[in-house]
Design a protein with these regions (language model features):
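Bacterial N-terminal signal peptides that target proteins for export
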Residues: 2-12
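Bacterial N-terminal signal peptides
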Residues: 10-20
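Boundary at the C-terminal end of the N-terminal hydrophobic targeting segment
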Residues: 24-26, 32
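Short, gly/Ser/Thr-rich active-site loops of penicillin-recognizing serine hydrolases
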Residues: 309-310, 323-325, 358-376
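Short, well-ordered beta-strand elements
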Residues: 329-330, 338-357
Length: 376
């Protein structure tokens, strides 16, 4: 082989390397800027004086980066890691909305189906006409549980819930499909509809139709034991956080289940920042997944009920229109847990925040972190 060939080949490689170097530098510079933004916002919210800890996952530039602060269990000095398991609280509603979207895409149910089609025991004048679509978009008119007396305690039964729904009369000016009112009761009812339609528990539906196809192996919808703790194997329970109040008081044992009654459609799902990073990839087009599941995820994000110029409701997700960017997100919280998922689909950008304390200020992701990264 002639010497000129090697010289020519070396010259080509040198030129290519010069072209790639700026791209590599730009990517590393972008990563550093993202880390600076996230760290500067999150670190002050999870100091040594704050209760519990915080796990975050940021999807940007086609990759997931993790940020960890504080303790999963302060007494045991067990630190938070990307694999620590947190209670997702109302983030679970995203998964139930995805089940509805999957069923719609497969022709198994319709958004305009009345809930009484699947639960004929619902015969009240108002509730019998509420639709699946109204439940999943918080437009049914049903309220938060504390506004639906008699509600609730651990002896509150399914029969009492159905009786309450049949007796329900919306207040003046409220009607199914006419307003957006955030409701746990609506999602408890949605869970019952899904279980009746598919003749299987909601945990099995979520596991078989969403978690397994996405490869989310550290996300669980456990049954609740007699001690109100999640029933999970010991090796899994060792990864679960101790929950704290916003003042730092431990609330319940690790894995404790807070439920409005024995049908926990309002929450009770455990996952890690690493597993929810997989969900971020799927939601933002960064993973190869089943086309039907991709279509369902995209369907859940579509705004279906504009509330005002700044806010709109999708299927579980909320749309927040800020200057120059629209954030699609879902917060969740209990008195000992806080969770948040936020997306900027236009920039293929997303964030997960998981905290083992009540009242964590997740708004910093919506109003500060996501807009700042979106401008890079």
């Amino acid at each position: 082989m002639q010497p000129w060939f090697f010289l020519r080949r070396a010259a080509v490689l040198f030129v290519v390397s010069l072209a790639v170097l700026p791209l590599v530098h730009a990517d590393s510079d972008m990563d550093a800027q993202i880390r600076d933004i996230v760290t500067s916002e999150l670190a002050p919210t999870a100091t040594a004086s704050d209760p519990g800890g915080l796990a975050a996952a940021v999807y940007a530039g086609g990759q997931v980066t993790f940020f960890n602060y504080g303790f999963a269990d302060a007494a045991a000095k067990r630190p938070v890691t990307p694999d620590t398991l947190f209670n997702l609280a109302s983030l679970r509603k995203i998964f139930e909305a995805t089940l509805v979207a999957l069923g719609t895409g497969r022709g198994e149910l319709r958004l305009d189906d009345p809930v009484s089609k699947y639960l004929p025991e619902l015969h009240g004048d108002t509730i019998s006409h509420v639709t699946i679509g109204e439940l999943v978009t918080h437009t049914s008119g049903l309220l938060l549980p504390t506004d639906h007396p008699p509600w609730p305690n651990e002896t509150f039964t399914r029969e009492q819930f159905i009786a309450m729904l049949n007796a329900w009369t919306p207040p003046a000016g409220v009607a199914p499909g006419k307003q957006r009112i955030y409701t746990h009761a609506g999602y408890v009812l949605l869970q019952l509809v899904l279980e009746r339609r598919y003749a299987m528990p909601i945990a099995t539906l979520i596991e078989s139709r969403i978690l397994q196809p996405l490869g989310m192996t550290s996300t669980f919808v456990p049954a609740r034991g007699k001690d109100n703790r999640a029933i999970m194997p010991p090796e899994i329970m060792q990864r679960v956080v101790q929950g704290y109040s916003d003042q730092g008081t431990p609330i319940g044992a690790p894995g404790s289940q807070q439920s409005y009654y024995d049908f926990p459609g309002t929450g009770q799902m455990f996952s890690s920042a690493r597993d929810l990073g997989i969900l971020l990839r799927a939601l933002l087009g960064g993973a190869v997944i089943d086309p039907a599941l991709r279509a369902a995820l995209e369907m859940t994000e579509q705004e279906s009920f504009p509330v005002d110029q700044k806010f709109g409701q999708a299927m579980a997700w909320e749309h927040v229109r800020l200057d120059g960017v629209t954030v699609i997100d879902k917060p969740g919280g209990l008195n000992n847990a806080s969770a948040y998922v936020g997306l900027v689909p236009a920039r293929r950008l997303g964030i997960v925040l998981l905290a083992n304390r009540g009242e964590y200020p997740h708004e910093i992701a919506r109003y500060r972190i996501l807009p700042a990264i979106a401008k890079l």
